[in-house]
Amino acid sequence: MTDLAGDLALIVEAAREGAILAGAERVKGLEIERKPGGSPVTSADYAVDAFLKDRLRTARPDYGWLSEETPDSPGRLKHRRIFVVDPIDGTQAFIANRPWWCIPIAVIEDGQPVAAVIHVPELSETFEATIGTGARMNGKVIRASDTDALEDASLLASAGMLQGPQWVTPWPPMRFEKRNALAYRMALVAAGAFDATVALTPKWDWDVAAGALIAREAGAIVTDHLGGDWRFNRPDPRQDSLICSAPALHPLILERTGAIPRAS
C-alpha cells in the first residue's frame, strides 16, 4: 500500500481549495441547470469538478476518476486506485445558501475506501480518515455514539420514510432532522452528533464513499439496509441503500429494514 498519508494530505488540500473556488463562483453569480432527473447543477459544480480533476489526476496520474459531474468511463475499472468525488454534495443547500453543503473526496483501492475527506467550508469542519487510523474532525479524534435504544436515537432522515404499511414492526418515536448533503449526514453520525442516517433507495458512490470510511473509522457501522457490505468502483457506481449508525443501533435498525426488498 502506497503512502496513504500523502493521499490524505492531497485530497484535504484539494477539497479546501475547491471550496474557495465554489465561493468565488457564487460571488460571480451562479448559473443553474436541471439534470434529466430534475436535480439542480450549477456553474460552481462544474468549475470545482474541473479543478479537482486537474489537481488530483496531475498529482496521481495512475489513479482512475469517478465524479458526479464528469461523464463516467469504463476505463476507471482498470485502475486499482481511483478518486471518487462529488464537487459539491448538497447542491440545493449551496444554492439556498444553507451551510450544509460539502466537498467529499475518497481514494478507493481494490473496491474499498482507504483515504477520505469531507470538507464543510461554511461550518469550518473538515472530517478525514485513512484506513486503520481512526477518524478526525479538525484534527481531533471523533467517535460514533454509544446510544443503544431506538427510543433514545436521533436520526438524519425523513420521518415520513419510517411510516406506512411496509413496516412490519412500527418504529418508536425518535428525533428527526434533515441535512441536504448525504456525505455530511454520515460525517455527523461519525462524530456522534446524530445516531444514524438511513436511506432505502440507491445512492451514488460519490455521495457515500468518503462518508463510509470516516464513519467506519469512527466506530459506526455502514451497510445496505439488509446488512450487506458495500463495494466501490463497480460498473454500476451505486449502492443499494444506506444504514449508517452507532454500533449498538445497527442490529435494531436491521430488524426493521430487513423486511424491505432491495430496490435494484
Model-identified regions with their sequence ranges:
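N-terminal subdomain of lithium-sensitive/metallo-dependent phosphomonoesterases centered on the IMPase/IPPase/PAP
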Residues: M1-I88, L249, R262-S264
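Short loop/edge segments at beta-strand edges and connector loops
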Residues: S67-E69, G139, L226
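A structural micro-motif at secondary-structure boundaries
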Residues: M137-A144
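An extended, acidic
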Residues: A144-S264
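Short coil/turn connectors at secondary-structure junctions
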Residues: P61, H79-R80, G111-V114, L150-D152, ...
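DPxDG-like acidic metal-binding loop motif
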Residues: R76-R136
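Residue-level signal for inorganic ion chemistry
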Residues: A22, D45, L56, T91, ...
